[in-house]
Structure formats: C-alpha cells, structure tokens
C-alpha cells in the first residue's frame, strides 16, 4: 500500500496520483458493443439467442429456453437452505422499510389568484435490472435494484441474468422471488442490455435499466442511454476508512479487505491520526491476509490502488475525504454522528466502529448501488426516487390568466415569439 503524509510537500501530487484511474473507453469494446446492439435492435429474439449461445455457451433452441417463470423462481427459493431463505427475507424487509421512507409524494397549492400549482409523482411503467451471473453471482444486487422499484410502484420489473453453460444460481433466483421481480430472462452481456433498451418480440422495451456488469455491459448502458434511462456506469469499488485508533486493528483491516477482494482495481484507503495505529493495522493485514481465499486479488488491489494516509487531526481527515468523495466512507471514530456533519461527499457513510461496510452491502437497509470514481460530488445512491418521475401541475384560473397573460405576453414579445404572446393575450379580457 502507498504511504502518504499530509505534512509532506508532495502530498497533493501523491493524492492525485492515487485517485487517478484510467477510465478511457476501449475502442474495440465500443465497436463490438455497437455491432451487438444494432443487431439485436434489427433482428430481435433471433440475435439474442445467437449471442447467448455464443457467449454463454448455452444451447437455446428458442426464446422459450431463456425464460424463467414465477414457478421457477419459487422452486429456486424452496431449494435453498432455510438460513439463506431467512437471510434473503430479512435483507429484503429491511431494504423495503428504508426505501419506503424515500418515496416522493405528490403535492399542490393554490396561489393568491386561484391558480393551482403542484407536482405529480408517478412510477416508471417498466424497468430492467441487470444481474451478473455464473460464479460472480450477487443476490444482494437483485434486492438492492428490484426492491426500490417495487416500493416506487413499478408494475413490471424485468431481470436479465446470464447463465454460463446453463448454470443457474438458485440464490440469485430466490432473491428475485423475494424482491418481487416480475419476469426473468437468462440472457446477459451487451445483448441483454440492447434487448431491454429496444425491445424484442419477447422482451418488452423498458423505461430504465439498472444494475452492475462487466465492461461490455457498461459500454452498452452508455450506448442506449437516451433511448432508456440508466442508473449509472459504475467504476471499481472503493472504501475509505477514517480511524481515530479506538477501533480494533483487525476490524479495520478486514473492512479494507472487504473492498479489495472485489477485484484488482478496487480501492481501499485508510486515513489515521496516529502512525502507530496505521502500523498496527498494517501488521493486522499482514497477519490476516493468510486466511483470505481471495488473497491474490486483495494483494493486487492494495498494491495497485491502496493507501494509508497520516493526517494531523480528524478535521483534516474529513477535508481529504470530501476531496476523495468515496463510494463507502467508514467513520471509525468516537462521536461519529458529529463528524458525519463535516462530510459533504460520500455515497454512504458508515458511522461508528460497529458499522462495518459489509453490513450496508447486504442488509442494513440503505442501497449498496453507490456513486464511484469521485462522482459522489454530484450524484447519489440508487433509491426509490430513481424509479419515480415528477410532472409539474398547472391549472390557471380566469383571474390568474389576466395577470400571468400580461407577464407572458411581454416576455414572449421580447423573444419575438408572436404566437406565444397571442396565445396568452387571447385568454385576457
């Protein structure tokens, strides 16, 4: 891991280098994705079947072979162990409860001239959620993407999940059952994104696509944005831990590992006010890494993008955190709620030594789909509001038409838009 000290003259340069990440789009990936999207848009189900058989090594004869029914999802739920059933239901219940509190409501008021103004909230009609399949299967992603849509009132939630070599993950399908997914298609990659965006003979066009995926899925989401909405194009996972030395070093070490084990380009950063404590955490990491099944990935991640930063105090730690704008921020300090008030930019803030980031990933309640790559400066976690729309309401009274008409007429003439002005004037006495 890199070692930085805010008192060093080259600290700012070192911090910028630490956060630098090459996000340039791969031209070859973009070309392949463009061809796939165009083909699926043109040939629909036939193209989808061909690409699925090619990339996932399946043997689908027709689109019916790529459809899972509610009975299939229920059967998957029944096959998993009881403790896993309970865990899925507990997580779903907590996520639902949290996202119910995010739900936007319609409102209106009447001004002094009798004109009604307001905002009408409506859910999206149909959404698609992409879930990685095969060995890298994440049932938690199903719950985090589907449950907010369900809470928002989306009538049709369509899930696509690849099944390499026909391998279905029962826990993922059980999560779909628990989270209220309407339909499931066993397709993945750019071809699945294209099918959701443009529609095929069998897969209906959706209004928005959410969910994580590989580079081809990310490129496809970028390409279809505008035809449909998307949640975000997420970068590598990140964690930043601010520690005052009161949390056991082993706990912090494992929290850093929890993000580093995602992949070799994930980023784990520890900010501390004591060099002795940073050394203690480093020693814990050296000891605990021996027990990690994904040791190679963790070591590569920490070596590539990990860091320990020594600061003079917690105020400085918060300033640096706001600059980094991490996906996950752990405030492993005393009085965490007070320090949280100093945080302006973070996807999720985990307060106190008992609030491990992994609890938020799975079952605390808030969404684990979070902005990465410093985008927390201007964006937010996935939520119920992402599956709702706002429409403005205006009902002008006869009296209001006189006052507003005069104002609108003057402004319209100022813009040389005569029809606009006349439309307002016709309603004036």
From Swiss-Prot:
| InterPro entries the record matches | Ald_DH/histidinol_DH, Histidinol_DH_CS, Histidinol_DH_monofunct, Hstdl_DH
Please state what class of enzyme this protein is. oxidoreductase
- Entries under Gene3D superfamilies matching the protein: 1.20.5.1300, Nitrogenase molybdenum iron protein domain
Q: What EC number(s) would the UniProt record show?
A: 1.1.1.23
Catalytic residues (positions): 327-328
Instruction: Give the stretches traversing the membrane.
Output: none
Q: Which reaction does it catalyse?
A: L-histidinol + 2 NAD(+) + H2O = L-histidine + 2 NADH + 3 H(+)
Keywords on record? Amino-acid biosynthesis, Histidine biosynthesis, Metal-binding, NAD, Oxidoreductase, Zinc
Q: Could you tell me which pathway this protein works in? A: Amino-acid biosynthesis; L-histidine biosynthesis; L-histidine from 5-phospho-alpha-D-ribose 1-diphosphate: step 9/9
For the ligand (Zn(2+)), the binding residues are 259, 262, 361, 420
Protein residues bound to substrate? 237, 259, 262, 328, 361, 415, 420
This protein's cofactor list reads: Zn(2+)
Any one GO CC term of the record: cytosol
UniProt GO BP: L-histidine biosynthetic process
Q: Which Pfam families match?
A: Histidinol_dh
What is the cofactor note?
A: Binds 1 zinc ion per subunit.
What's the superkingdom here? Bacteria
Q: Which GO terms describe its molecular function?
A: histidinol dehydrogenase activity; NAD binding; zinc ion binding
Q: Where does NAD(+) bind?
A: 130, 191, 214
Q: Which NCBIfam families has this protein been placed in? A: hisD (TIGR00069)
Family listed: Belongs to the histidinol dehydrogenase family.
Known role? Catalyzes the sequential NAD-dependent oxidations of L-histidinol to L-histidinaldehyde and then to L-histidine.
The entry's protein name is: Histidinol dehydrogenase
Organism, per UniProt? Neisseria gonorrhoeae (strain ATCC 700825 / FA 1090)
